[in-house]
Amino acid sequence: MAKREFKAESKRLLDIMINSIYSQKEVFLRELISNASDAIDKIYYKALTDDSLTFNKDDYYIKISADKENRTLTIADTGIGMTKEELEEHLGTIAKSGSLAFKQENELKDGHDIIGQFGVGFYAAFMVADTVTVITKAHGSDEAHQWESAGADGYTIEPAAKESAGTDVILKLKENTDDENYDEYLDVHRLKAIIKTYSDFIRYPIKMDVAVNKPKEGAENEFEEVQEEQTVNSMVPIWRKNKSELKDEDYEAFYKEKHYGFDKPLAHIHTSVDGAVRYHAILFIPENIPFNYYTKEFEKGLELYSNGVLIMEKCPDLLPDHFSFVKGMVDSEDLSLNISREMLQHDRQLKLIAKNISKKIKNELKSLLKNDREKYESFYQSFGRQLKFGVYNDFGAHKDLLKDLLLFYSSKEKKLVTLEEYVSRMPEDQKYIYYASGDSYDRIEKLPQTELVSEKGYEILYFTEDIDEFAIKMLANYQEKEFKSVSSGDLGIENDDEQNQSDGDDSQYKDLFEEMKKTLDGKVKSVRASKRLKTHSVCLAADGEVTIEMEKILNAMPDNQHVKADKVLEINTNHEVFKTLQNAFDNDKDKFKLYTGLLYNQALLIEGLPIEDPVEFTNDICKVMA
């Protein structure tokens, strides 16, 4: 029995197979099970065109057996088997794929899928085994053969005894090292876990002998441990079943089984597409926010299967960031995988799937918003922030997709409203969509800047999250209505009498306002008579794109860039305080400076901005009270 050399550059190539292609050793089992599944598939496909062949699915299965005493692991199948020539051709040549050749020779039509295509998966066995033995008997043949190899040095082929057609792959596991515990691949529970992770949806039964406790025959209340053959994989994935066959409870059970979350899913999406790219997907919108969702540790992504075999536990490219909260899986026959089947080549199919999934998620959320507002608002409390980030990120690339999903608190209804709801009830004379920003609903409601807009009967959106104003700035408008902060210099509210009066005030008190600006020494861009204040004495407004709320948020970030809004101090010239200020301007310059500082600090406090010198501020209050 002469040892034969591999037909490829064996030592170098096999070394790459063992040490470089696969990131995790446990995937060897996935590869060998996939090969076994392919071997059974080949009989099935031949039976489709050969009337002399019959295919009874009950006769075909994969058996995994662990022998702890001899440190061997066997993966056996009842598939098509191999002849001596096929052993030589497929196992004697690294990267020669028998499955790919079978596909090409038989011109399999869409829907008839064999997993293997690279011809390297078998050699993953050498990651965990010193010696690999293959005993095989081809379907319809009377002869069996044994292929054996200890690695790159070569292999042997010799006659063997085997009763039925199929293939047994026997791994003599490596000895344990300080870094690797190869004994784990002899543990039934560990093997079941690997199968559940990667190969749960292989279409044929994967059987194992499992120890179970059963009542001892002839003895009352006594049990004995016996070996029982069990099928350890699910075989038919839920996503390939008709939706009409499934209930909400089935989806919830799948959600829990896959450990997508401890909560119940708020909604699910089950879709099957057979177009430019074929895929099945089950997606879940969770009820509660994951504890680490807004941390660096959170990883977005969907489980990705190719033909029922898990390829990636989290494929980030299938979800945009704004839908990163979605859990679930995708199974496709059309993916371009790399040689290890662990990563994807970034191709057109993947992008198409991701695009379609994004639309499905958006439509589901829109449907939830329309048909179950309470449930949608519950979702929005958890993940609305992420939708707003989606509007803002990537220079607004996704704003049109997301804008109808946004909710904001309203001054009129004191509840969350959509932009469409707001615009639909705008009076004809209202030019803008008005908003106010602050830490909470109650605090915004008390802002002096809201007085004029509220008096006109216009609705105000209350922005209570730091991302709100940035998202709206990126959105710019909705249904051709621009957004306008109640703190903006020009509110676009026409009032001829008030306009004339205000203009007169600015002219009449020009010197006073100039002196106030001088006293504040660059802290404000200007001082002017307010058109918006009714009962309050003073407020801050902002000219330009950066609002006061944006200044607060940007300067609170770790990379504080000391952003400054163009602040304008607005004075209510009809307020009693202004008369006191005017009297001081005419008669007591020191008091005038004192009052100016107090009014400015009062405006800062209203906005939630820090006072530069709290001690000086309290001393000034004492001077006024003394």
Curated annotation (Swiss-Prot):
Cite the Pfam families for this sequence. HATPase_c_3 (PF13589), HSP90 (PF00183)
Q: Which GO terms describe its molecular function?
A: ATP binding; ATP hydrolysis activity; ATP-dependent protein folding chaperone; unfolded protein binding
Region called B, residue ranges: 342-552
Q: Which domain of life is it from?
A: Bacteria
Metal-binding in keyword set? no
Principal location class: cytoplasm
Q: What is this protein called?
A: Chaperone protein HtpG
